[in-house]
């Protein structure tokens, strides 16, 4: 390490503090410190603590989390047990920071018993298991609904389309799969083993959690956690304040070495000087986090590590490992720092001196009291006089004294009920010691027999004493009481852990798997970071959001599927194909399994969401009725899903059903399914078309196809539909599309009709093929294949028994994307056997070509190959793109000859409302206004892209969405926008063109 070439003291002495070198040194040091602080502020996450905290409480939270987070103590509102609530927020963020925060689907985190609204408002990739175990849980859910509604109403654009991710199932019953989990003060109701069983049900490997901790619970009936201002107390049951009066010896035996109790002991947590709601938890569950170390369950062994104990809060982690575990001695200690200065003293608890109890007294107080008692002891004095002397000394050492007008506490105040008995016990102890010392002196100065006995060797003395005691019991010396007990400051647990079930865990293969997965995910994140960096350099004033990035759907062909259900017996054939030596068969079987699991999870999520709403409204699984708070609950959910509604048994709907909407299923106490007009049931947007479970079942019943998959990867407008039309043979082919709109367009192009029997027979959607009877064909032609999951394409081929699939699509346009952010999607991308490119467009005008090239250069990561960098146009239209700013939706020029597209559903709804106000025909706002995603594959003469808001919208930064928007027209394209949107790719490219 380099050393300084000059002496600071000499420098200041010779040149003074105004010297140039001294000034430069001070400036340099100050600059380094300031730079360090700025770097901390930049990398530290801002955490706002609204609770009013005192000076000591503020120091507690800053000492614990001030180095990790940029804490802002705003002191806005008084809250019950404010420090505990503030710590809970920091604990949640701290535990989440232990896991990958990329936002990728495989990094979903579970929260056992947490607050789902906290994660919803912060945009965390977290699923909460929040069961309704009692009235308090239901109260919390109602309050969270209110908070969510209040915040959404203040900023609806930020939460547009975002759904709260939680369920009301107990953690062990929830089916959501994730590698990571947290439990913030949620383990009290589950215990260590309950958490391990919940982790096993979720396929969770690592859990991090927190809980209140006081080692004195191991032997005391009550105590205080001073930092949290919390008093805990053991009670017999949750409904009785009877103390746990078990003797100390029995208590130690039962709490440390035995798991069997004759009654159920609860621990009540009360916050001192706060008349607020307290908490009561099972002592057995709390004790398990102090005493247990490992737990083996269903082929997994789970171990707990106690990481940090600070301010009365213990942070722990539970890690599960598969396979065999050789025997190992695991040791841990529970320390009791609160009793290191105390000694135990036995005092009488009954007049006959049969029952005794142990009290704690300061060692210094007892030592000084006993010293004086021993010096002042006199056999000739009455015991009462000596008792008064001891009480006087004891009082002086444990009471408040006044010195020079200042009151001071001498020692520690003794309980008034124990004060007299402590003095009496010290008197008995003093008398016993004098008697023992007298006997020892007499033994030393004994008679001839005693001297002869003392002269014997030790074995002979022991033998002779035992014989005399056996023959003459009355000569046995009196048994004395042990008054003083040394209190141990810790308890040690030695547990031998071993597990011999299951197969050996191949750690090397697992390491290779994780590394490969991380590389793939890292490339996705690097591309996202590069894109953000480019935006930041172009727009240096743009604020970067702290929210996690959007989940990615990039596939990873080397990894298994996380989130799919365990394979059952009926899938043996498809499951076996995933291990086929033929690579493409294995890939297709794996993709089909993933697609089936994905559709099943969509169905389960729909059922879970509807059941949650049903329960929130007061419904249950037995009766067809709801409670009276319907409007509050449904108004709240309506802000995030405008299709939420109630159908009453009278046939009336709570809200008007949107025109053209027909709900195919509903949910009530009988579950999800078709309902009659005389039933009470609820619906949401997923109830219009609800076929996910059927698609999953059908896909699982099929086998992976062995035919050839060919893909024509062409630019927008390259004539894909024309090519399908030219090669279509009715005798051998069937045309399959990704959605209903594309099917109608192809039917019109081939048969000049969208609903004729012939058109509907030969042109069908992928869902229609899987759900309905259909003839077998030798070849299937697929339009817009990138909108299909690879597993669904394989299922279609298998259902049709096709030996060849010719797929048309643009790999750079909007691809299939998961509707469930919690599902770990890895095999959605089409894997063709043959690929051909088409880089000539016949639709897009000449001026669109350089615009798209510019967009690709700006939006795609450096080094990315794109066919749009060399595409050409055969269109005769040379100039087609224009843009103009508008103030509101009323200035949008709605013309029946134009086709209108938007990026968001909110803008689409605004355009439809405007069209209705202008009394335009239903066919116009039903068929001529679409989102960009809905318009993929559509070709129109005149297109208008409308943006009505300037709030952040990532879709305007994505090349695929901007590409689709800019390549739908043949003659003219007009971009009408409100305000300036930072990062608007289309506006920037039009301005530079």
From Swiss-Prot:
One of its GO terms (biological process) is mRNA modification. ATP binds at residues 714-721. The keyword Membrane applies. Disulfide bonds: none annotated. Residues 712-975 are annotated as: ATP-dependent helicase. It is found in: Host endoplasmic reticulum membrane. Residues 72-290 form the Alphavirus-like MT domain. It is a peripheral membrane protein. Residues 839-993 form the (+)RNA virus helicase C-terminal domain. Residues 545-576 are annotated as: Disordered. One of its GO terms (cellular component) is membrane. Its main location: host cell. One of its GO terms (molecular function) is RNA binding. Interacts with RNA-directed RNA polymerase 2a. Belongs to the bromoviridae replication protein 1a family. This is Replication protein 1a. It comes from Cucumber mosaic virus (strain NT9).
